[in-house]
A protein has these predicted regions:
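Non-catalytic beta-strand/loop surface segments
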Residues: 5-87, 121-175, 195, 199-241
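Extracytoplasmic/secreted cell-surface and envelope-processing proteins
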Residues: 186-190
Length: 241
């Protein structure tokens, strides 16, 4: 809440209302009501954007020699990474720990559109459709059956409140790790990391249920229609040991 805004208190009032409207949007299937709520969300988002300092985090990282700022998500982890000049370790640690203490989910609407674009980009390829269906059946009822980027239905009904609950559950120190590589003095760096990243909530590591995969009942087939005539694709999956 200290990075990316000129007035967080005023911005937060609007962001809280936006979160409530997203919950209401997810709770209704009425087309007229959904259109009405989407218009309200859009109007509020425009007002909230007036308090935003675009890309301030990126610029701060770059100011201190940082490059290749990016993030990635897989089935079991989310990672954030970039390179930076070692003489700026103090600034780097301050900036990166700050965003994990109390993140603000601003510009959610535009970020959601970016996710939609990525979903559609991969969904238009033949292999992606086949592999997604194979993975869905192969791992059911394990969470791996669910696509990493989310389902189309889920993306149509996003909830900022769920994002906040996810953060509070999983973004605790006991469930996180920090990896540094390069030319630096460990004895000099450790006190800096302890004074900055120790601000992250301790918390208990989230409980994870072990989901046993039921055996296949002989040979199973899943048919998938792809929007390309005269093209056939096949994917096979086998359980290992």
């Amino acid at each position: 809440d200290k990075i990316g805004t000129i007035d967080y208190e005023s911005e937060k009032v609007l962001l809280d209302i936006i979160a409530e409207k997203y919950d209401a949007l997810a709770d209704t299937e009425d087309p007229k009501m959904r259109a009405h709520l989407q218009q309200i969300i859009n109007d509020l988002s425009v007002r909230a954007a007036e308090y935003v300092i675009p890309n301030e985090f990126d610029r701060l990282i770059s100011r201190f020699g940082g490059t290749k700022l990016n993030a990635g998500t897989s089935y079991d982890y989310t990672l954030y990474f970039n390179t930076f000049s070692p003489q700026y370790i103090s600034q780097w640690a301050e900036i990166n720990s700050e965003r994990l203490v109390n993140p603000v989910f601003r510009l959610f609407q535009s970020e959601l559109e970016t996710v939609y674009e990525e979903k559609n980009m991969y969904g238009d390829t033949m292999a992606s459709v086949a592999i997604e269906k194979l993975t869905e059946r192969y791992f059911y009822p394990h969470p791996y059956a669910y696509p990493i980027i989310g389902s189309a239905e889920n993306l149509k009904n996003p909830r900022l409140s769920e994002m906040r609950r996810f953060f509070e559950k999983y973004y605790v120190a006991s469930n996180m790790g920090l990896i540094l590589s390069g030319d630096f003095d460990t004895e000099e760096v450790l006190p800096i990391l302890e004074s900055t990243f120790s601000r992250i909530r301790k918390g208990k590591p989230p409980h994870r249920d072990i989901v046993a995969l039921p055996p296949f009942e002989g040979r199973e087939k899943v048919s998938v229609r792809i929007p390309m005539p005269f093209v056939k694709i096949m994917a096979l999956g086998f359980r290992g040991v």
